[in-house]
């Protein structure tokens, strides 16, 4: 409540079929669309039935940070929302935001609120699939299972190579960014964060709701701008 998440719903296969029931449970007053793809006509109709003000988050949307990314129109809304979500929790702080999802992204915002950009790397499932699909004989290995220091068969060699490789990659980014920002604090989010949140040295915060927090902050910020404009 307030700025804290109350509930969540996940809908697969590009459908919003469960949204009506969710809206009946929680009567929304306003909303924000942060989709990284274009919505289908069916999705647009479903959202229209909510009959609430809906902000579409685009590269033109006012945001409470300074976006220094050189190609803002190509910047994924989820990346920017993650930055804003972390910044809303730790304002005035140098931050590294690591989002371990389909891809793993590394974003940096400084204590003055300047977002400088970040890097994108293959996520866990993408790495596991690539080893299977781009080789002749390597199997598709599940992420769940033993992760020894050195693999003792092909399955553990692949799993350890991927998961430990990502762990060392994350730790390397933290070390590199802390050399530039000595007081840097780190957030880890994303669906695959649970594979790393207890194993990463110098990891400060984990929060599964960083992106929704950012979208909520953007929505509130635009409401504040509208209210102030009406008072002027």
Task: Enumerate the language-model features and the residues they cover.
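Divalent metal-binding pocket/active-site signature
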Residues: 98
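Nucleotide/phosphate-binding catalytic cleft detector across ATP-hydrolyzing
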Residues: 2-95, 112-232
């Amino acid at each position: 409540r307030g700025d804290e998440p109350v509930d969540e719903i996940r809908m697969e296969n590009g459908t919003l079929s469960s949204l009506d029931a969710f809206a009946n449970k929680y009567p929304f007053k306003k909303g924000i669309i942060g989709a990284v793809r274009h919505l289908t006509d069916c999705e647009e109709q479903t959202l229209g039935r909510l009959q609430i003000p809906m902000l579409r988050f685009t590269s033109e949307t006012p945001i409470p940070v300074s976006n220094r990314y050189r190609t803002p129109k190509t910047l994924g809304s989820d990346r920017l929302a993650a930055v804003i979500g972390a910044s809303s929790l730790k304002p005035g702080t140098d931050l590294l935001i690591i989002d371990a999802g389909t891809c793993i992204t590394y974003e940096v915002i400084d204590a003055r609120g300047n977002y400088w950009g970040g890097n994108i790397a293959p996520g866990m499932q993408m790495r596991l699939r690539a080893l299977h699909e781009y080789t002749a004989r390597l199997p598709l290995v599940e992420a769940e299972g033993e992760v020894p220091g050195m693999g003792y068969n092909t399955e553990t060699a692949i799993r350890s190579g991927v998961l430990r490789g990502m762990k060392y990659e994350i730790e390397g980014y933290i070390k590199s960014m802390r050399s530039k920002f000595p007081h840097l604090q780190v957030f880890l989010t994303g669906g695959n964060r649970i594979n790393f949140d207890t194993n990463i040295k110098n990891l400060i915060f984990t929060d599964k709701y960083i992106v929704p927090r950012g979208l909520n902050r953007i929505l509130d910020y635009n409401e504040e701008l509208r209210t102030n404009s009406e008072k002027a």
